[in-house]
Amino acid sequence: MYTRRRLFLGLMAAGLLPAQDSQPTLQVTGAVKQALTLSADDLAKMPRATVKTTSGGMETLYDGVWLHEVLKKAGVPLGSELRGKALSSYVIAEAQDGYQVVFSLGELDPSFIDNEILLADTANGKPLFGAQGRFRLVVPKDKPGARSIRMLTKIEVVQVRK
């Protein structure tokens, strides 16, 4: 065991194994006009929002950016542009461990539905970390919390019809 650790540390020092990212990022890809790679610093420069959730009797205040604002920044059609072929688009949110959840593009547009989804980077005033990951989605109106995905690393926009 001790030998393995020394080998691992030696390979890292030699640059043969990558060190962990010091600045986690979120990729926004797929059917977008401009693919994005966002850091916590990038999100901090965008308009902020707060959502309060209750789970297991505990309240949490999440702070972040509305997901539709991130999609808008990537050039995804929303608002009056979300019609016709664009309505057949959906979004896959993917976590670091491969867990995925899906939203129709209409579900993410506040002009279609009153269920804004938060891309959170802080909870109760502190940056998310550890098991939460650096980014997570908070879906306050979903009854089960299964789509409030944590450890978020990628958002992919997919168009069903070509």
Language-model segment annotations:
Residues M1-M12:
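N-terminal secretory signal peptides and thylakoid transit peptides that target proteins
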